[in-house]
């Protein structure tokens, strides 16, 4: 039973694209897009996965 999938990071030097394509993290937080969730994981050293596409 898979809880979620790993967020894929792009190697964007300027940060994430400003595209609103929300994903729901396994931490119960809605992220504006997959890239932003991935960046948060990198900054906080957390293993949050994508629970589902769309807001939580």
Curated annotation (Swiss-Prot):
User: Domain named Kazal-like: which ranges?
Assistant: 3-56
Q: Does the UniProt entry include the keyword Iron?
A: no
Query: Site Reactive bond for trypsin: which residues?
Result: 18-19
What is one GO cellular-component annotation here? extracellular region
Q: What species was this sequence derived from?
A: Ovis aries (Sheep)
The transmembrane segments are: none
Q: What is this protein called?
A: Serine protease inhibitor Kazal-type 1
Task of the protein: Serine protease inhibitor which exhibits anti-trypsin activity. In the pancreas, protects against trypsin-catalyzed premature activation of zymogens. In the male reproductive tract, binds to sperm heads where it modulates sperm capacitance by inhibiting calcium uptake and nitrogen oxide (NO) production.
Which SUPFAM superfamilies does UniProt cross-reference here?
A: Kazal-type serine protease inhibitors
List residue numbers at the site (Necessary for sperm binding).
20-21
Q: What are the annotated disulfide bridges?
A: 9-38, 16-35, 24-56
């Amino acid at each position: 039973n898979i809880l979620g999938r790993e967020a894929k990071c792009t190697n964007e030097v300027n940060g994430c694209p400003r595209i609103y394509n929300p994903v729901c993290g396994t931490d119960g937080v809605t992220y504006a897009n997959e890239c932003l969730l991935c960046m948060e994981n990198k900054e906080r050293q957390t293993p949050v996965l994508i629970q589902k596409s769309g807001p939580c």
